[in-house]
Amino acid sequence: MGLLEGKRALITGVANERSIAYGIAKSFHREGAQLAFTYATPKLEKRVREIAKGFGSDLVVKCDVSLDEDIKNLKKFLEENWGSLDIIVHSIAYAPKEEFKGGVIDTSREGFKIAMDISVYSLIALTRELLPLMEGRNGAIVTLSYYGAEKVVPHYNVMGIAKAALESTVRYLAYDIAKHGHRINAISAGPVKTLAAYSITGFHLLMEHTTKVNPFGKPITIEDVGDTAVFLCSDWARAITGEVVHVDNGYHIMGVFGREEEIKKEVYGD
């Protein structure tokens, strides 16, 4: 029996088969979870429905998290189709592309508001609205963060601030929902080759750097993140809440360099 057998999981943020949310859905499906999906805009509907079909699901609903009405409709949709919910996967983050140019000092007021609303407040809004569906089910919520919440990653800009706020939100929500028997955690994933990631200036250099420096010397995959999400949302992690779990092959533990001797050889030769 799979680790999530009999669990009902809502997956937000699936954009394509390279997205982290897709990797999570893939791992959840393998472990026996039933899946429902959201899409943010009409142009994404067909793609998300095709992805859902691949996992044997026809539960797909529009949810623009900047609209309270959409979030209420999401709850109604899940009530009508499932009646209850065990897991929420919050894989939602956005800032206008111009906010990734220049430095954080160039952040616009509107860009800041949008980034915080969609990337952070949406977690609060979804949790509050869907909590009644998780009553008595020892529910689990997982969201996605990144190392840019802790340290400066050039050009990540306002999204780094948003991710820092997201991690704090996880801790506060963990306290709030514990009395209902539910848990929430964040996964701080290393750089993954998603389409969204390539909107960040110099992302390919960031990938090269983190791969060279992390102790394993290899990149992170969506499967790595997906399998971690399975654990965090399973009963095996029943005593874990309010955590930020790094899934980055150990990159966050390093100082300036990792695999120093190999890097010296690359730079200076044998």
Swiss-Prot record:
Entries under Pfam families matching the protein: adh_short_C2
Catalytic EC class: oxidoreductase
Residue sites binding substrate per the record: A95
Keyword annotations from UniProtKB, A to Z: Fatty acid biosynthesis, Fatty acid metabolism, Lipid biosynthesis, Lipid metabolism, NAD, Oxidoreductase
Pathway annotation from the record: Lipid metabolism; fatty acid biosynthesis
EC number assigned by the record: 1.3.1.9
Gene Ontology terms, MF aspect: enoyl-[acyl-carrier-protein] reductase (NADH) activity; identical protein binding
Chain sites annotated for binding NAD(+): G13, S19, I20, D64, V65, I92, K163, V192, K193, T194, L195, A196
Membrane-crossing residue ranges in chain numbering: none
Record bears the keyword DNA-binding: no
Catalyzed chemical reaction(s): a 2,3-saturated acyl-[ACP] + NAD(+) = a (2E)-enoyl-[ACP] + NADH + H(+)
Active site (catalytic residues): Y146 (proton acceptor), Y156 (proton acceptor)
Single biological process term from Gene Ontology: fatty acid elongation
PANTHER family, per the entry: ENOYL-[ACYL-CARRIER-PROTEIN] REDUCTASE, ENOYL-[ACYL-CARRIER-PROTEIN] REDUCTASE [NADH], CHLOROPLASTIC
Function recorded in the entry: Catalyzes the reduction of a carbon-carbon double bond in an enoyl moiety that is covalently linked to an acyl carrier protein (ACP). Involved in the elongation cycle of fatty acid which are used in the lipid metabolism.
Family that this chain belongs to: Belongs to the short-chain dehydrogenases/reductases (SDR) family. FabI subfamily.
Subunit structure: Homotetramer.
Protein name, entry field: Enoyl-[acyl-carrier-protein] reductase [NADH] FabI
UniProt source species: Aquifex aeolicus (strain VF5)
Underlying gene: fabI
